[in-house]
Amino acid sequence: MSAHTRITRKTVTAIRSTKGIGSLVSLTAYSAPMAKLVHDVADVIIVGDSVGMVLYGMPDTLRVTLDMMIAHGAAVVRGAAQACVVVDLPFSTFQESPAQAYRSAARLLAETGAQAVKLEGGCEMTDTIRFLTERGIPVMAHVGLMPQQANAAGGFRAQGMDPLSAAQVFDAACAAERAGAFSVVIEGTAEALARHLTGTLTIPTIGIGASPACDGQVLVTEDMIGAFDAYTPRFVKRYADANAVMRDAIRQYAHDVRHRVFPEPAHCFGYGKPLQLADAGATV
């Protein structure tokens, strides 16, 4: 690539225009190094509040703060030159009122440089989504299994498995579209429901434990590469065992240090050359 070639970041408008064309690739990232690994492959990078569980060892996403999301979102934007970056609004930063959501979302976009925010919720979030989008804040909706509402839902359970639940998920997704959301994540739902929603909505659906018929798919990158093994959701396909590779490297490093194999001459400065000490006049 020429040094003068300009790399263009994918926009919210570009993501929305992919409806029915190809399949969107989405992954998570919480740091600049991970963002650099995935930005030229992923269409969308989601800086998820799953950072609390994956990086901080939290039992759920409820303890994640807005300041945490801003810090991680800014790092990802610095590392990702091409993908559209979407940052989660964490629990308790948007549910109180549309005005609260606006203040939180405005901070996220202003302080991270991200292109959009993502928020979880059903039909009760319709006014909030509309309030944000009418004020220039792009919103990715999130329906179905919503980790922030796991306590109320009785745990991390698949949604849309009965007629009432299916209707609630369907209505929430349709309401989000009408309110101006540019796309919607459908998580942990009955496959037939996700397929039906994808055929009904005019905005892209991004599935995670949903359906191959969705307009795109997303996984937590650490789940997908095998770098997070506290537990593995049913919908995750592991493409590598990064933890095994890292453990082997760590063990090899420890072995080399204990046996004085590392550092080698190539890792040292002036190895084997005599050193003259200016004050003492001695050579070491």
UniProtKB/Swiss-Prot annotation:
Its cofactor is Mg(2+). Keywords: Cytoplasm, Magnesium, Metal-binding, Pantothenate biosynthesis, Transferase. Its EC number is 2.1.2.11. Binds 1 Mg(2+) ion per subunit. It catalyses: 3-methyl-2-oxobutanoate + (6R)-5,10-methylene-5,6,7,8-tetrahydrofolate + H2O = 2-dehydropantoate + (6S)-5,6,7,8-tetrahydrofolate. GO terms for cellular component: cytoplasm. Pathway: Cofactor biosynthesis; (R)-pantothenate biosynthesis; (R)-pantoate from 3-methyl-2-oxobutanoate: step 1/2. It is an enzyme of class 2 (transferase). It is found in: Cytoplasm. Gene3D superfamilies: Phosphoenolpyruvate-binding domains (3.20.20.60). Belongs to the PanB family. This is 3-methyl-2-oxobutanoate hydroxymethyltransferase 2.
